[in-house]
């Protein structure tokens, strides 16, 4: 972009004319830019010569100075143009202002010497005056020239030849080579530092991208694993709910058949079967021998044990029923003690349990009434018996029998005479008096 001289044209032109005019005291004018723009403004003027001008130059700016000096040889006025670029100016600004030098030279016309300066050593007044003296073209002064007539006889003309000093020449050349090499080394060092910095920056950028990619892959993998776990838990929960809602008789796997296959796989020489024989009521035989005119026995009131407070597990959802074993329950639940010794021995042999440690029915001291199912509203006569309940358990959930080999019960019902025939299935009496199998995880044993 070109330099703008029209914005402050009047001030610029006035200072320039004052320097050209020998009648004015102003012998130098200094120009610079307005901020970072290309508009030229008048920075300062003065009448103190080069010494005063040098003090006004700033190391952080690009400036143009026009100064009037006297030729040391002829005493005539000479004009010097100084293109000043401070050491603190940025490289981009230097490149932009380099194109303005020719424009400023056309504006500040009449300069005998032009100096491009960057440091204070380039604008020392002595060095500038030496350049002005060399530019005059003659080493004489018109005002100091003496008349030839007054001169005395001239002596022989002496030679101006000077012998070359080899050492000084070597030192001068060596110094120049040294500084040139130093500048070259410094330039190479800066270039190497830039390459190293760029390489380190690229390496850090690659590591950052690789780390971010690994972290993203890890997060994605954890998310997929978590999603799979959630889906598996949801499917398992749905299967559990579906199995709980389907009755035992309608399930795809029949637990009785599974247990039957398991029981068949056992060796035949195992313990005595836990299946009891058919029960026969001795009370019927006894009543058949008695005459019809015998008075009916007095009714006996049943004394029921108050139910214990129910014990519920942490979750009220009934667990799945385990595989039941195949078993045949007895046909009757009444065991009467006979007064006859022979009959008593016979009944004890019939009701002996298949297992050695547990009896299905133990001896009782009184008889129970077998006429409880009479449809008429007549009083029910029962034979007073003493029943031993054996191992008891309280129902935690309700269970409906799938067939006649199982028993049904409601929560808090008491189940007595329990036999542990399998790990998942037990056998006992329900409150209704039925004997059969039931799932072990539906009840809680009572101490």
UniProtKB/Swiss-Prot annotation:
Alphabetical list of InterPro entries matching this protein: ADF-H, ADF-H/Gelsolin-like_dom_sf, Drebrin-like_SH3, SH3-like_dom_sf, SH3_domain
Xref: CDD domains: ADF_drebrin_like, SH3_Abp1_eu
Subcellular location field: Cytoplasm, Cytoskeleton; Cell projection, Lamellipodium; Cell projection, Ruffle; Cytoplasm, Cell cortex
Domain SH3, first and last residues per copy: 388-447
Gene Ontology biological-process entries: neuron projection morphogenesis; positive regulation of axon extension; positive regulation of dendritic spine morphogenesis; postsynaptic actin cytoskeleton organization; regulation of actin filament polymerization
Domain of life: Eukaryota
Protein name: Drebrin-like protein A
Species of the source: Xenopus laevis
High-level lineage: Eukaryota, Metazoa, Chordata, Craniata, Vertebrata
Gene: dbnl-a
């Amino acid at each position: 972009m070109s330099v703008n001289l029209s914005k402050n044209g009047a001030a610029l032109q006035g200072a320039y004319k004052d320097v050209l005019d020998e009648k004015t005291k102003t012998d130098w004018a200094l120009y610079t830019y307005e901020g970072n723009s290309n508009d030229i403004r008048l920075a300062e003027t003065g009448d103190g010569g080069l010494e005063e001008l040098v003090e006004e130059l700033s190391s952080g700016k690009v400036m143009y100075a026009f100064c009037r000096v006297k030729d040391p040889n002829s005493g005539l006025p000479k004009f010097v143009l100084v293109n000043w670029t401070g050491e603190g100016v940025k490289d981009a600004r230097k490149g932009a202002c380099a194109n303005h030098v020719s424009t400023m030279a056309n504006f500040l016309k009449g300069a005998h010497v032009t100096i491009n300066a960057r440091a204070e050593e380039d604008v020392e007044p002595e060095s500038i005056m030496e350049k002005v003296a060399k530019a005059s073209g003659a080493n004489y002064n018109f005002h100091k020239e003496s008349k030839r007539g007054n001169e005395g006889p001239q002596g022989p003309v002496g030679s101006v030849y000077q012998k070359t000093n080899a050492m000084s020449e070597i030192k001068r050349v060596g110094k120049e080579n040294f500084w040139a090499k130093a500048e070259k080394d410094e330039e190479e060092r800066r270039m190497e530092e830039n390459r190293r910095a760029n390489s380190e920056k690229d390496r850090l950028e690659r590591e950052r991208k690789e780390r971010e990619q690994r972290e993203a892959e890890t997060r994605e993998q954890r998310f997929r694993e978590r999603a799979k776990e959630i889906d598996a838990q949801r499917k398992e929960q749905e299967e559990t709910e579906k199995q709980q809602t389907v009755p035992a008789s309608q399930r795809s796997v029949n637990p009785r058949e599974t247990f039957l296959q398991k029981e068949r796989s056992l060796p035949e020489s195992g313990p005595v079967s836990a299946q009891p024989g058919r029960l026969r009521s001795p009370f019927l035989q006894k009543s058949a021998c008695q005459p019809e005119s015998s008075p009916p026995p007095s009714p006996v009131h049943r004394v029921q044990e108050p139910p214990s407070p129910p014990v519920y597990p942490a979750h009220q959802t009934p667990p799945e029923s385990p595989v039941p074993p195949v078993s045949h329950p007895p046909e009757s639940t009444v065991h009467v003690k006979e007064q006859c010794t022979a009959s008593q021995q016979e009944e004890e042999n019939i009701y002996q349990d298949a297992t050695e440690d547990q009896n299905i029915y133990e001896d009782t001291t009184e008889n129970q009434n077998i006429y409880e199912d009479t449809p008429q509203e007549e009083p029910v006569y029962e034979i007073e018996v003493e029943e031993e309940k054996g191992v008891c358990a309280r129902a935690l959930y309700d269970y409906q029998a799938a067939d006649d080999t199982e028993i049904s019960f409601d929560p808090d019902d008491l189940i007595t005479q329990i036999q542990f025939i399998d790990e998942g299935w037990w056998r006992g009496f329900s409150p209704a008096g039925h004997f059969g199998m039931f799932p072990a995880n539906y009840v809680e044993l009572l101490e």
